[in-house]
A protein has these predicted regions:
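NAD(P)-dinucleotide binding in Rossmann-like oxidoreductases
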Residues: 50-53, 67-147
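Generic anion/oxyanion-binding catalytic loop in active/binding sites
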Residues: 18-21, 141, 158
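A structural signal for well-ordered alpha-helical scaffolds and beta->alpha junctions
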Residues: 25-29, 99-100, 145, 149, ...
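C-terminal helix-rich "cap/oligomerization" subdomain common to oxidoreductases
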Residues: 137, 146-147, 151-192
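A short, mixed-charge helix-start or loop-turn motif at secondary-structure junctions
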Residues: 14-15, 133-138, 162
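Rossmann-like NAD(P)H-binding beta-loop-alpha module
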Residues: 1-6
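Rossmann-like dinucleotide-binding domain that binds NAD(P)(H)
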Residues: 9-81, 87, 101, 167
């Protein structure tokens, strides 16, 4: 994976007890944690409180991972449009998830680059672009909360390990807390 980029924005609903990071970002942080499957090294975050109530209503989080993987999350209560989209770019393919799309929620692109080292005196690195097909895998339509509850019940009944265990929840909370600390310090990098 090269990068993970997520946008979760809409107009409201403003919360009175948490900022936009704690309200909207946990979803994308948990997806990021599962997909990247590595522990983030550090986080930076910036945000703004436009209403003057002490709670950020717009925020940008950047997580840094080993091997130069970067993840970016944008959350916002002041957007005129509702966007729920994630892009993941890797060495072989690229994925775009759009939760607002009624029929094509996931698109897989066979696009990418290949770095070619040369002995040429002018250019010592060349970039070759690969453009292939795009396809939309059929994803069964399920209610997310019902699926989660069925999985939880199955783990209890069959004594199996859940997809998202307590450690995954802990990692999400650590990133949320570090993001809040970074926002309060004007984007200071916080080691995890």
């Amino acid at each position: 994976i090269y990068y993970f980029d997520s946008v979760r924005v809409n107009l409201g609903l403003f919360q009175h007890d948490v900022n936009v990071v704690w309200d909207l970002a946990p979803h994308d942080i948990s997806i990021m944690d599962h997909v990247i499957n590595r522990k983030a090294v550090s986080i930076t975050a910036t945000g703004a409180d436009h209403l003057g109530n002490g709670l950020e209503d717009v925020a940008y989080l950047t997580a840094f991972y080993p091997d130069n993987i970067i993840a970016h999350i944008h959350v916002n209560w002041l957007s005129p449009v509702k966007i729920r989209q994630t892009q993941i770019s890797g060495t072989k393919k690229m994925i775009v998830w759009d939760d607002n799309s009624p029929s094509e929620k996931i698109k897989v692109y066979d696009k990418g680059i290949e770095v070619i080292q040369t002995t040429d005196q002018i250019y010592n690195t060349l970039i070759q672009y690969r453009t292939g097909d795009m396809y939309c895998p059929k994803i069964p339509q399920t209610e997310a909360l019902a699926f989660e509850m069925d999985h939880f019940a199955d783990c209890i009944e069959n004594d199996t390990q859940p997809i998202s265990d307590g450690y995954a929840g802990l990692r999400v909370v650590q990133i949320l807390e570090s993001s809040e600390k970074s926002i309060k310090n004007r984007g200071k990098e916080i080691r995890l």
